[in-house]
């Protein structure tokens, strides 16, 4: 069968794109991939049609060649077609390279046993190196244009098989000084360098001279399939979370290169950074992130290599580059950014965020950067939201929210205002227009706009979003909470149709606001019975706020409202309020009301419900009424009512998700042994738990996987069950453990529940050095102190002292790690940080408000953690 015509291919491609799965399932779909590869070599089809065919293969490679065998054959055919192209310039060469790479990757055929892979890799590296590959690949000028495409293909292969191109590092580095496209080569080199550092650190290997070019010929370049195959989980690096998020996904490589590799590594990174200004902003951001992420945990490599770029990047107007700067700041902190740099960066963010011509997305980006600004020395516990310390009155004045702002911008600025109010708890009495005054004025304006009868629903939604944000951020501000409750009560009085919004707000707010708001809304409802539509909203609100309230006023309201309940919807709303009262025990007045409703309601369904509620009230005690009418404790009902009879059987076969039946807490830690151990305590809450299995997951890849723990049984009332959880950090950094419990109930059902995450603090990783012979302590410490340099780093930190003094502080927090003690003047402290680091402290003579601390470590990445730890000792 000959090649299809242009019209036939156009019709076939159109049918395929309309529904790929349906087309491939039909008769024509069986030979689509074969026909496509065959017709690419036909001289009867124009180049434009072939471009369409190759574009289709790029978009739907996984459907055309779904398995490794088909993908291998397709890639081989595409490479053969590439070789057979005439020497004249052609747009097909670039697409053929991309199509062959895509087929191998999407089909899972990329590997050391793949013949197509062994042909493609040398070809791509040769094109990327600018070598003359022969007339089959076009003229020399056209081959230069293929360099960028070859770099893109190599980058895709490296992402799929990290460490594959480690042996080509020297060749790729040599390309930076040659003529050719700078951006593709720079990004490829940065990616390969990043993956090589991480992959080599996984197996404890060094760079082994990989950065030095030995032989640039494509045939002799060693493809490191060993590392690529052993690293079975593809790298999926994420941008560093900022400290306020508390959910960083960091994976610090631990690598200690020899001096020669260190020099070459510094030179390669400096070379990449020096030429980064020639790249597009997005490419620059990617390059900076890759290098920063790779070097973050590399021993002996402080981030000063990035310092020359800060002068240029701090003044950038590109959002992507600004985000990279903030990511570097979050990663390296005061090790890279001075206090002047921090003040300049925050001032710039603040001033730009006030520009009136900013588009809304850009405006929100700058506000988010301010809200999540990674500070060098943050106050308060890690993960707690707070406004930047350097955001003084002059800077914050232009960031106040206004009713004229876009809703999302208003909420972002309101979030910042709430954080400022939280910091200004001790406002001066003479301050007339402080943050709290401004906040109350803004809330009053939002409530007035939402109270307009018939006004836009968006204004009401914005008002409740702002109210929720305020109560979430200012739970400990009674003045603001009281003002907010009063304003919301006035809003309901003016516009009862907003009852659904109030119900949602009551479900979401904290108990500090829920109870006073419930009482105020209850008073507003019973004071204004209303008719028709207003009555419908009052009954909906009353069903939410009636529980726990005195019933006399509510029953009077219901008796007056029953006269106006004329349709089925109002009947149901009235009965929902009665049900809410029944859950709290009911009473004689409620029994009379239910009897009256059972006689008077026009709807038969309503009369039956009223009669049922009366029977329950007459025959059940208050506690049993609450259980019968409260939320069901059983498993959720099945979707089909036909399966109701088998409900219990189905529940017994399924693992049900429930609320946590146990409490897991962190006990006092003991620093001893070769590995840090997290001491936990498990306690049952209300019911016994059997065959308990606790599964732990560490955020990111900071630690080795934590094994599950099995406990035969835990009963309430018994002492807490001790649990020792060994940790194997890959780098000395704090982390969070997500915990899931799988257990059996006394009824024999298997359930699972998510427990609150556990925090592993930096101090929980501290381990002491082995016990030393008496008299050798000082010499041992001096040897450790001298061994830290020049590979390590030295710094000085001011440690505030509380009222307890230096001796008490050392005794409480650092006693197991003291090597030499000369109280009350000097303490020499040595700490082991798993897996292979150490921290040395010299606490000198204490002064009035603190003590100067000289420290050395062989891992500069722990400097910000050490600074935060020492500054926070006085608070504990």
Curated annotation (Swiss-Prot):
GO terms for cellular component: AP-type membrane coat adaptor complex. The keyword Repressor does not apply. It comes from the Eukaryota. As part of AP-5, a probable fifth adaptor protein complex, it may be involved in endosomal transport. Probably part of the adaptor protein complex 5 (AP-5), a tetramer composed of AP5B1, AP5M1, AP5S1 and AP5Z1. Interacts with ZFYVE26 and SPG11. PANTHER family: AP-5 COMPLEX SUBUNIT BETA-1. This is AP-5 complex subunit beta-1. It comes from Rattus norvegicus.
């Amino acid at each position: 069968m000959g090649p299809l015509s242009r019209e036939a291919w156009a019709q076939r491609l159109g049918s395929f794109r309309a529904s790929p799965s349906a087309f491939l399932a039909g008769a024509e779909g069986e030979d689509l991939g074969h026909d496509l590869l065959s017709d690419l070599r036909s001289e009867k089809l124009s180049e434009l049609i072939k471009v369409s065919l190759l574009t289709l293969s790029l978009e739907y490679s996984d459907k055309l060649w779904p398995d490794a065998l088909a993908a291998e054959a397709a890639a081989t055919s595409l490479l053969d077609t590439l070789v057979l192209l005439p020497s004249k310039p052609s747009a097909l060469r670039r697409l053929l390279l991309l199509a062959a790479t895509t087929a191998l990757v999407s089909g899972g055929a990329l590997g050391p046993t793949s013949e197509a892979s062994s042909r493609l890799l040398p070809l791509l590296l040769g094109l990327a190196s600018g070598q003359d590959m022969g007339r089959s690949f076009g003229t020399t000028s056209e081959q230069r244009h293929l360099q960028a495409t070859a770099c893109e293909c190599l980058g895709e292969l490296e992402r799929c098989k990290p460490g594959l191109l480690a042996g080509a590092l020297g060749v790729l580095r040599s390309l930076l000084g040659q003529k050719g496209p700078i951006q593709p080569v720079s990004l490829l080199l940065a990616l390969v360098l990043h993956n090589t550092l991480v992959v080599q650190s996984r197996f404890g290997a060094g760079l082994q001279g990989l950065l030095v070019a030995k032989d640039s010929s494509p045939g002799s370049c060693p493809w490191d399939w060993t590392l690529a195959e052993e690293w079975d989980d593809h790298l999926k690096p994420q941008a560093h979370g900022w400290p306020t998020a508390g959910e960083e996904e960091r994976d610090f490589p631990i690598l200690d290169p020899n001096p020669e590799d260190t020099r070459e590594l510094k030179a390669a990174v400096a070379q990449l950074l020096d030429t980064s200004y020639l790249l597009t902003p997005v490419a620059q951001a990617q390059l900076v992130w890759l290098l920063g992420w790779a070097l973050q945990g590399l021993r002996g490599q402080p981030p000063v290599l990035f310092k020359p770029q800060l002068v240029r990047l701090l003044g950038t107007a590109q959002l992507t580059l600004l985000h990279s700067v903030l990511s570097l700041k979050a990663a390296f902190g005061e090790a890279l950014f001075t206090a002047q740099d921090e003040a300049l960066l925050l001032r710039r963010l603040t001033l730009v965020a006030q520009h009136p011509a900013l588009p809304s997305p850009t405006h929100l980006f700058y506000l988010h950067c301010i809200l999540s600004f990674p500070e060098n020395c943050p106050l308060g516990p890690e993960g707690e939201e707070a406004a930047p310390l350097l955001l003084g009155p002059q800077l914050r004045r232009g960031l106040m929210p206004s009713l004229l702002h876009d809703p999302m911008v208003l909420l972002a600025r309101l979030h910042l205002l709430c954080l400022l109010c939280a910091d200004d708890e001790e406002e001066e009495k003479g301050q007339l227009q402080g943050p709290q005054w401004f906040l109350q004025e803004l809330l009053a304006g939002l409530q007035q706009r939402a109270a307009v009868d018939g006004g836009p629903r968006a204004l009401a939604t914005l008002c409740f979003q702002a109210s929720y944000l305020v109560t979430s951020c200012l739970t400990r501000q009674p003045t603001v909470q009281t003002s907010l409750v009063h304003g919301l009560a006035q809003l309901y009085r003016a516009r009862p149709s907003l009852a659904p919004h109030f119900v949602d707000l009551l479900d979401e707010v904290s108990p500090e606001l829920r109870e006073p708001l419930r009482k105020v809304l209850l008073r507003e409802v019973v004071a204004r019975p209303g008719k028709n539509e207003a009555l419908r909203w009052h009954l909906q609100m009353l069903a939410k706020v009636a529980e726990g309230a005195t019933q006399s006023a509510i029953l009077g309201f219901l008796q007056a409202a029953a006269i106006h309940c004329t349709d089925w919807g109002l009947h149901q709303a009235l009965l929902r309020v009665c049900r809410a009262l029944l859950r709290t025990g009911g009473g004689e007045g409620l029994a009379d009301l239910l009897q009256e409703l059972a006689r008077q309601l026009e709807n038969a369904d309503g009369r039956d419900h009223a009669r049922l509620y009366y029977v329950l009230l007459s025959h059940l005690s208050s506690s049993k009424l609450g259980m019968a009418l409260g939320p069901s404790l059983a498993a959720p009902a099945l979707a089909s009512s036909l399966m109701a009879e088998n409900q219990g059987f189905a529940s017994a076969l399924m693992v049900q998700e429930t609320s946590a039946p146990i409490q897991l807490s962190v006990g006092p830690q003991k620093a001893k042994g070769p590995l840090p151990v997290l001491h936990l305590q498990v306690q049952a809450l209300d019911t016994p738990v059997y065959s308990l299995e606790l599964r732990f997951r560490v955020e990111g890849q900071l630690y080795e996987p934590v094994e599950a723990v099995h406990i035969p049984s835990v009963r309430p009332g018994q002492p807490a069950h001790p649990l020792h959880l060994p940790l194997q950090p890959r780098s000395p950094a704090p982390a969070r453990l997500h915990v899931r419990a799988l257990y059996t109930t006394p009824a024999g059902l298997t359930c699972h529940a998510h427990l609150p995450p556990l925090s592993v603090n930096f101090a929980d990783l501290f381990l002491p050095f082995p016990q030393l012979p008496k008299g050798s302590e000082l010499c041992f410490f001096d040897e450790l102190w001298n061994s830290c340099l020049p590979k390590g780093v030295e710094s000085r930190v001011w440690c505030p002292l509380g009222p307890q003094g230096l001796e008490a502080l050392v005794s409480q927090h650092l006693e197991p790690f003291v090597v030499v003690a000369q109280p009350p003047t000097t303490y020499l402290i040595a700490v082991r940080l798993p897996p292979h680091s150490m921290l040395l402290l010299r606490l000198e003579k204490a002064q009035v408000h603190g003590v100067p601390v000289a420290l050395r470590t062989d891992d500069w990445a722990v400097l910000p953690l050490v600074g935060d730890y020492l500054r926070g000792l006085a608070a504990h």
